[in-house]
Amino acid sequence: MLLLKASAICGKGNEGKRNKKGGFTLIELTVVLAIMAIILMVIAPNFSYVKDSAKAKVDKQNCAAIERSVEMLLAEDAISSSVTNIKITSSNGNVQISGISDDTGKSKLQDLLEDLDKPQSGDSYNVDIENGRKVTVSIV
């Protein structure tokens, strides 16, 4: 009897029991992966919204910069008040301007807009001038 108790205390007699090692089971890993997949499915559409929103904001800022530049050149009479429409195209860092016949006004506007990027949502910027004062910029 005394031998049995000693073997139980020393851990002998447990040969039939499974020796457990630390780690995760396949079910636990599967559950974690499923939860991560669900989280990604919820978050992914928000990333595309943020990207589209950023593009729209860049276009809006570029339009505002063009508007201020044209208004300034109109105030300086570098652009004639008879000009009613200007088309601005930017590609590979080159800004092309059509609708201004005066080379001085055209070159001043090109200098002001030298860092202008191509619009994110179109091909070019369209500048409408009403009564030689009111400037409206849109993307075409």
Curated annotation (Swiss-Prot):
Keywords: Membrane, Methylation, Transmembrane, Transmembrane helix. Residues 1-23 form a propeptide. Its main location: membrane. It comes from Clostridium perfringens (strain 13 / Type A). The modification N-methylphenylalanine is found at F24. Not yet known. InterPro entries: N_methyl_site, Pilin-like. It is found in: Membrane. The chain crosses the membrane at residues 24-44. This is Prepilin peptidase-dependent protein A. One of its GO terms (cellular component) is membrane.
